[in-house]
Amino acid sequence: MESPNLGDNRVRGESLVPDPPWDRCKEDIAVGLGGVGEDGKDLVISSERSSLLQEPTASTLSSTTATEGHKPVPCGWERVVKQRLSGKTAGKFDVYFISPQGLKFRSKRSLANYLLKNGETFLKPEDFNFTVLPKGSINPGYKHQSLAALTSLQPNETDVSKQNLKTRSKWKTDVLPLPSGTSESPESSGLSNSNSACLLLREHRDIQDVDSEKRRKSKRKVTVLKGTASQKTKQKCRKSLLESTQRNRKRASVVQKVGADRELVPQESQLNRTLCPADACARETVGLAGEEKSPSPGLDLCFIQVTSGTTNKFHSTEAAGEANREQTFLESEEIRSKGDRKGEAHLHTGVLQDGSEMPSCSQAKKHFTSETFQEDSIPRTQVEKRKTSLYFSSKYNKEALSPPRRKSFKKWTPPRSPFNLVQEILFHDPWKLLIATIFLNRTSGKMAIPVLWEFLEKYPSAEVARAADWRDVSELLKPLGLYDLRAKTIIKFSDEYLTKQWRYPIELHGIGKYGNDSYRIFCVNEWKQVHPEDHKLNKYHDWLWENHEKLSLS
């Protein structure tokens, strides 16, 4: 029987033979489970096509398929469900409908606009279901069948991908013929196929969840084991380093103590003669403290040797010292008691030094204690001597250099320029030159210079200006403006000029950069180091640079 031409590219007389139903169902499931989106970020969950024609064997499969609640896909359309794998919306499902022309629609609104634009009357937006069914809609009675089919598909992912390509090519090229004498409608066959694919999809998802949980548990166990192993190795390394360093310290301390004891053997006879009852009491207190705090017998023997002074006990302490060295290599408990031993050593030094306050203590005893414990303790006399720094002593202040004075500068006579500046006249008296800069500050020369001569006639020196009344000075400076402020500035400047030790006049009250530059150019031979900002000083400064060779200026 010839199949009708339904818009495909086949020849009109070509016959189409339908595939067996079980093979096509497998291919549909493979497409639903193995497909990944083109961008690699979406997982194709299911892909449903409407079979244009219904197989006669569909009735036999209807009893083994799970029923779903969504409508079948319209004729020629394809329904694709994708799950997002990444991003903030990972796990969300997207439903697409692909038209026979290849157009993709993601929402019911865009689909309705498309149908309205093309004038479609047979199809309605309600025929397309964009919802994803919940998990509970699948009948659990058929799980064993879908699980068996799924396990047969899982081992070979390459076979699945090949089957996907085959099914897609078949969908694009093949059109199934309409069977004659079928009792079921196309809707029931589409429902059965979609139900079986969805059932297998649910089982595949459950298996993937179980596998992911197992992998997470195994990773956690591995990380915990790695962390514990690394912590153990770190602790072992730290312990070994501490043991090695403390062994070396113990060796050095034992050797030094034995050497000091050997040097002090000849002095023991003198100590036995000079020891007094008070020293005996001190020995008893030292021995009690050693018995209470010292964990090892070697230290007790050492303190008995210090207090007794007999040669037999010295040999016993030497043997105890050797035993102590052997114990440091074998026992780790003595390493922990290192800090306690140091505290005991300081305690014994304090007791022996405090023995000097007793009435009948000898100088030999003091010498002995200072030699044996000079490494562990610092004498108090050395700390008490240097209470103040040498910098603050009077001797240091006398020897220190005083700040440079104005007399250290070499005076010179600045050459006369064609600009006729007032500084060229007053260079011989720095005070008058600086007073002129105060007058010329923010004031033109035509106004300031006549008032300046009047002021210098009335107040010819800094001593006179220092003792003047600021009201009289302000009356004189009224034509210049800011007369009160300038009068007070002149009086204070004159006082600091006489009393303050200054190097440059910018350190004085009321003198700025203009006055400082004028002083360095005209009073001191530092015109080469100055960069003036005043326009008159700039002219004079440039003139000096242009003519310094003719004027033989250094």
UniProtKB/Swiss-Prot annotation:
Keyword Nucleus in annotation: yes
Protein name: Methyl-CpG-binding domain protein 4
Species this protein is from: Mus musculus (Mouse)
Source organism phylogeny: Eukaryota, Metazoa, Chordata, Craniata, Vertebrata
Annotated segments matching region Disordered: 1-23, 154-195, 209-252
Function: Mismatch-specific DNA N-glycosylase involved in DNA repair. Has thymine glycosylase activity and is specific for G:T mismatches within methylated and unmethylated CpG sites. Can also remove uracil or 5-fluorouracil in G:U mismatches. Has no lyase activity. Was first identified as methyl-CpG-binding protein.
Active site: 534
Domain MBD: 63-135
Keyword line: DNA damage, DNA repair, DNA-binding, Hydrolase, Nucleus, Phosphoprotein
Gene: Mbd4
EC numbers for this chain: 3.2.2.-
Modified residues (Phosphoserine): 296, 402
A Pfam match: MBD
